[in-house]
């Protein structure tokens, strides 16, 4: 089947396009295009979130910070993770970071330790502010996510937790369209995330006094808490 009169034929070979002089399957070209768009939007969104977080910190008179799920320069050579750590680096430039934690090593300019967000190794009221930017969808199932929120509430006077919206058409971790709405596909990608959240599911994890922003179709939800 094809548009012969326009010299365009749709056939098995129509799945091949050219990118920078090399043959690229259509599916791969689409994936790369979506990925570039996701990365560009991700950088825009992270900068927007950074301004919001810095304004929140100033309003609350924050003295020091705990970064939950901190990343540093270890991903600098990976173009797919080029935007990771943007928010954390900016916060570290403006506020003292008392500690950054992750379950994997990170190269940071501030103190860092391996730790689990579900069992933070800190005393009550350890820090003035804690941030978990797009971390809660990685820590496990509902009970694990709830425990993470409880731990952040225990160790910090104020916190911000952000997470991607499960019902946004683009899945930011894998740069796919709509597939993350299929339970079987999500199960196969548990290495990328464990439990994506809707607004209702996220709200159910939070303290009653926490404020949640982001509409039903927003790409990201942001929760703010002040004790």
Where on the chain are the PLM-derived regions?
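Conserved class I S-adenosyl-L-methionine
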Residues: 158-183
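Hydrophobic adenine-recognition pocket in adenosine-nucleotide-binding enzymes
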Residues: 135
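Short alpha-helix
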Residues: 188-209
């Amino acid at each position: 089947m094809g548009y012969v009169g326009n010299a365009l034929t749709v056939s098995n070979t129509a799945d091949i396009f050219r990118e920078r002089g090399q043959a690229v399957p259509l599916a791969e070209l689409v994936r790369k295009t979506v990925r570039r768009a996701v990365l560009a939007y991700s950088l825009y969104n992270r900068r927007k979130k950074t301004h919001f977080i810095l304004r929140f910190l100033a309003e609350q008179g924050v003295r020091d910070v705990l970064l939950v799920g901190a990343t540093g320069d270890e991903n600098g050579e990976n173009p797919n993770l080029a935007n990771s750590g943007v928010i954390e680096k900016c916060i570290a430039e403006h506020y003292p970071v008392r500690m950054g934690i992750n379950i994997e090593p990170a190269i940071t300019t501030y103190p860092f330790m391996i730790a689990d967000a579900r069992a933070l190794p800190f005393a009550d009221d350890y820090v003035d502010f804690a941030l978990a930017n797009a971390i809660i969808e990685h820590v496990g199932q509902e009970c694990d996510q709830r425990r993470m929120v409880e731990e952040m509430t225990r160790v910090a006077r104020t916190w911000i937790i952000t997470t991607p919206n499960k019902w946004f058409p683009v899945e930011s971790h894998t740069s796919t369209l709509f597939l993350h709405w299929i339970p079987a596909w999500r199960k196969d990608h548990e290495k990328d995330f464990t439990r994506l959240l809707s607004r209702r599911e996220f709200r159910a994890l939070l303290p009653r006094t926490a404020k949640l922003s982001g509409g039903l179709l927003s790409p990201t939800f942001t929760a703010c808490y002040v004790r």
